[in-house]
């Protein structure tokens, strides 16, 4: 939809891409996704277990309602080749109130 800005756009990893450790992530998110210039990222294996955690870190001024580029790195243990997994990008929510939660999940392959 023209004129609509998504709250977060993931550039790397692409959906269903094959990943290996270290996994470098990058994209753009609205400034409201960050708290202290970061937001959490989790990598889940085929069983849904969290196998790595890290942060998307703003690479420019984050205290804005505009889009902010981010990068991050996740280091994870070896997984069976061809097994599915998911990368969870989670909006920072300093308030802890569920109405401010947001996330996007990207499917990947190991």
Locate each region found by the language model.
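Ser/Thr-rich low-complexity repeats and stalk/linker segments
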Residues: 7-14, 18-24, 28-110
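Proline/serine/threonine-rich low-complexity linkers at boundaries of modular beta-sandwich domains
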Residues: 1-6
